[in-house]
Amino acid sequence: MPVDQSFNAPLSEVDPEIAAVLEQELGRQRGTLEMIASENFVPRAVLQSQGSVLTNKYAEGYPGRRYYGGCEFVDVAEQLAIDRAKSLFGAEFANVQPHSGATANAAVLAAIAQPGDTILGLELAHGGHLTHGMKLNFSGKLYDAAAYGVDPDTFLIDMDVVREKALEHRPQVIIAGWSAYPRHLDFAAFRSIADEVGAKLWVDMAHFAGLVAAGVHPSPVPYADVVSSTVHKTLAGPRSGVILSRDTALAKKLNSAVFPGQQGGPLMHVIAAKATAFKIAATEEFADRQRRTIQGAQILAERLVAADSTEAGVSVLTGGTDVHLVLADLRNSPIDGKQAEDALHEVGITVNRNSVPFDPRPPMVTSGVRIGTSALATRGFGETEFTEVADIIAETLKPGSDLAALRARVLTLTDGFPLYEGLTQ
């Protein structure tokens, strides 16, 4: 009996509703400026790897040790991803199976801590992550979570305070990492504190992994017992996670924590896409993109601390940035984070409202916006374009701005930098 007609039919025929969604989303991405700090545009080669026949293959286990037959080719794909990740970051161990950053983080904690152990991470409201000890998250339910914060005057992490917290709580795990913090972390100081209290040091570099890969950000790998990351964000790979370590003695625990501890079958099509992304991340072209990413963020920060922005009540947390994002502080502005997000959306710039440390407003409103430059650097933006984007953002955040005129300026930029040429869905 032949395969039924729908098997080989195109998406537009089988499911026109979803086909329309894909077309509309492609149009949105092409016609707007994507500046959510956790988003990026993946290369077409990554899309091709992920949208492949590898989606059909079940492969519980690890290369050479599977619980299913027919894994000879997916073994090659996973081993390529492992070897490329290790080479890219200078690690001795890599697990490329985590479905997401959160899954990777859950596996890390399962490998290096026991339920009820104390963990110490950056406070969520000060730029930390849900998986670093938020009470409603698994990390806050399974573990005794303590937190360090930022200085109320500088908004920087004070390592003396981190040490005091570590001595007070005696955690089994110290977490260095963030979701909204615009400066480098002092990995050597974190290592010293962890050694002093007998803790494991886990670095979550989900946001800055691409910068590390390009050599434009300090690497945590030589200092941490374990490093986790997403593969999207600055790495511009598929939405997924990875775990790294220089300690081969932890390899068995980390592998077991991922499978069977957190997951069953790995997503082999996603793992193949990770391999492709890691290969691209080792190129000079990728490194140039990361340099432009940081340059763009610093141009934006400088524009938002200019006199006219300051007069409009806008400031920049920590006064600048070392990474791919800027945190605009609107506590003295007549508009809040939600209103700023909406205004920027209207002109065609996508950001997310974000709480700032000691924020007087609720989390669904906030007093800040988090603005990232990775996707625009991927699109090809350089100094000239980032200067224009920064001015558009600064003008949008002023009360009474001509949003229609600003939208026209955005369209000039998007028209000049086509995205996914030739792609229809």
Curated annotation (Swiss-Prot):
CDD domains: SHMT. The modification N6-(pyridoxal phosphate)lysine is found at residue 233. Its main location: cytoplasm. GO terms for cellular component: cytosol. Keywords: Amino-acid biosynthesis, Cytoplasm, One-carbon metabolism, Pyridoxal phosphate, Transferase. (6S)-5,6,7,8-tetrahydrofolate binds at residues 124, 128-130. One of its GO terms (molecular function) is pyridoxal phosphate binding. It is an enzyme of class 2 (transferase). Its EC number is 2.1.2.1. Homodimer. Catalyzes the reversible interconversion of serine and glycine with tetrahydrofolate (THF) serving as the one-carbon carrier. This reaction serves as the major source of one-carbon groups required for the biosynthesis of purines, thymidylate, methionine, and other important biomolecules. Also exhibits THF-independent aldolase activity toward beta-hydroxyamino acids, producing glycine and aldehydes, via a retro-aldol mechanism. HAMAP family: SHMT. PANTHER family: SERINE HYDROXYMETHYLTRANSFERASE, SERINE HYDROXYMETHYLTRANSFERASE 1. NCBIfam families: PRK00011.1 (NF000586). This is Serine hydroxymethyltransferase. It comes from Clavibacter sepedonicus (Clavibacter michiganensis subsp. sepedonicus).
